[in-house]
Amino acid sequence: MSELLSVALFLASVLIYAWKAGRNTWWFAATLTVLGLFVILNITLYASDYFTGDGINDAVLYTLTNSLTGAGVGKYILPGIGIALALVAVFGALGWVLRRRRHHPHHVGYSLLALLLALGSVDASPAFRQITELVKSQMRDGDPDFAVYYKEPAKTIPNPKLNLVYIYGESLERTYFDNDAFPNLTPELGALKNEGLDFSHTMQLPGTDYTIAGMVASQCGIPLFAPFEGNASASVSSFFPQNICLGDILKNSGYQNYFVQGANLRFAGKDVFLKSHGFDHLYGAEELKTVVADPSYRNDWGFYDDTVLDEAWKKFEALSRSGQRFSLFTLTVDTHHPDGFISRTCNRKRYDYDGKPNQSFSAVSCSQENIAEFINKIKASPWFKDTVIVVSSDHLAMNNTAWKYLNKQDRNNLFFILRGDKPQQETLAVKRNTMDNGATVLDILGGDNFIGLGRSSLSGQSLSEVFLNVKEKVLAMKPDIIRLWNFPKEIKDFTVDRDKNMIAFSGSHFRLPLLLRVSDKRVEPLPESEYSAPLRFQLADFAPRDNFVWIDRCYKMAQLWAPALALSTDWCVSQGQLGGQQTVQHVDKAQWQGKTAFKDTMIDMERYKGNVDTLKIVDNDIRYKADSFIFNVAGAPEEVKQFSGISRPESWGRWSNAQLGDEVKIEYKAPLPKKFDLVITAKAFGDNANRPIPVRVGNEEQTLVLGHDVSTITLHFNNPTDANTLVIAPPAPVSTNEGNILGHSPRKLGIGMVEIKVVNVES
């Protein structure tokens, strides 16, 4: 309703100003500004919905001040460009319409009415309401009801008798199981859902809307609110250290806790969270690659669901035979947005909707088949009678190719339970949320019926029932929840552990690299993750007088303040203010002791602007002084004009990547010498090993043969045509996720370059 009202007020404002207000520069500028704000707000809402599927939320607030990288970001580039072009076009059209009758005499009354209507359209828009509530949540000091409703459970279950299998279905919300809306989409898992305790109204709250947040909510009974973006949790050394979560209780009660997934455990700090709360046995992409039947059978995120659930079944069987009390948690990935992935063992690899194939629906149909097969194996085993099986979505689906169809339905998360000890078939329509999942499971296992803000849906009352405005209530509790992290409020002395890649201060430990914003009463950690911008881009957003401590590889800060370290991949510590003084110190000991020293100096805005501009230089445009191309640092030597076909720097060097160019091309500013040696230190990937690799300069071509290990080879070139471009053409680029950033499309690797040096041998 408010959306229609805001649009009506917007149109009324445009029409009244365009046809009645007449010409006046001030009124035109004011009205265009407010109407433009309406347009920006609604385009932001549309874009946010596209990326998150949940409007303008915490994730969007973070993304507005950082970069969206990782996780299939390439698939969002075209929509992003489209949104930007639409914004320019709408602004141009709006200005043209408002000036249609600019030659008519000015009328103050109509101008004022148009401006008031424009202001009303902004105030009534859902985007403005969402942003207002989000900003309020950042500024509140907490909610007095938090202490009333936050409850810590007992640390043990008296006399536990049941094993637990807990399956997180990636984005596998209950909406998919509506057979009227999506006929025969989930027949296998839907049939199992109907055999158990099916909770039909599990809503999604703020801070529970992505995988690690959904896991925290379901096990600890709180949303994932942190003083940093939630997916950057991999940088912390402990996760809500004060909280008692489901895994802690299980471990204290004699359970061995296992977690199995196909993706890398480090992504979003799942390993840190699980290790912090009772899980001693973790299996992700790195751990599984040595035990799965086909290590090369992977998607962009890791191993397919059929592989992961096969390994989960092996774990279940072995643990059940051992007689040891255990919990086995597993997380699927094939239904990850934006398109999903199809396991090769599925019987149904295609699902049509609206008369055409839909990749996301197809992935859902396939994944639920794999999950159902896993559950049916457990049900058919002699150990089911001692087992509780839980199936839940980690969060609602984000913007995938099925999302517009999902939004036409009443959306809820999936949560159902199959009890081997006490079969029970019932659909429970009680209002609840994902924070209640862990408490409900704990209740069934014989423990308390509450964890944090979560309550058992079998014997307690959910916050979703207590508060009609439960989303706003949870946002009001955000400061209280952040305080549970027990983050330090000051930093004076700190220690950098060079071997463990950690920094410690005020009793807290963080993985490196790390950026800290330091104020009188707060230390704000800004980690680097797959979803966040590089730290130098985050630092570029600091105000001129903001105090910072930045721990990163030396070459990343050297271009600003320490040119002598431009080729160093060691750790360095920089601190200061972007508009004031900065220092860079080389970490030259295994245990390096540092102190903060922020000087209260005059702010130089020219220096500030220069620092910000330099921080924002993209990697490929960075230049350093060197007599060779060093590939394990960003940029290139000053003599290089541009290069292509080369992937990002890694600790050892860089791969060629045919996704970025069929050949490696390095164009120098000046012609290469008439006669020179080309010294190449490199290795080959896959089928490129032990094969001739063409290397060209002008009309002359040599061949290079590399093995799988790094070697140094010298080629002799004549350059009579004064060519300035070096071309290397790997013969058989291999599509692979080897060494890839999680969620990115596969790279096509050919050769791995460590160093290339041009040696002039002209007499």
From Swiss-Prot:
Pathway: Glycan metabolism; osmoregulated periplasmic glucan (OPG) biosynthesis
EC number: 2.7.8.20
InterPro entries reported for this sequence: Alkaline_phosphatase_core_sf (IPR017850), DUF7024 (IPR054288), OpgB (IPR020881), OpgB/LTA_synthase_biosynth (IPR050448), Sulfatase_N (IPR000917)
Domain of life (superkingdom): Bacteria
Localisation per UniProt entry: Cell inner membrane
Transmembrane segments annotated in the record for this chain: 4-19, 26-48, 76-98, 110-132
GO CC terms of this entry: membrane; plasma membrane
Topology in membrane: Multi-pass membrane protein
GO molecular function, one term: phosphatidylglycerol-membrane-oligosaccharide glycerophosphotransferase activity
Main location: membrane
Class of the enzyme per the UniProt entry, highest EC level: transferase
CDD domains: LTA_synthase
Catalytic activity: a phosphatidylglycerol + a membrane-derived-oligosaccharide D-glucose = a 1,2-diacyl-sn-glycerol + a membrane-derived-oligosaccharide 6-(glycerophospho)-D-glucose
Record's keyword terms, sorted: Cell inner membrane, Cell membrane, Membrane, Transferase, Transmembrane, Transmembrane helix
One of the GO biological process terms: glucan biosynthetic process
NCBIfam families, alphabetized: PRK03776.1 (NF003000)
PANTHER family, per database record: LIPOTEICHOIC ACID SYNTHASE, PHOSPHOGLYCEROL TRANSFERASE I
Described purpose of this protein according to its UniProt entry: Transfers a phosphoglycerol residue from phosphatidylglycerol to the membrane-bound nascent glucan backbones.
Similarity comment text for this entry: Belongs to the OpgB family.
Protein name as it appears in the record: Phosphoglycerol transferase I
Organism in which the protein naturally occurs: Salmonella typhimurium (strain LT2 / SGSC1412 / ATCC 700720)
Lineage: Bacteria, Pseudomonadati, Pseudomonadota, Gammaproteobacteria, Enterobacterales
Gene: mdoB
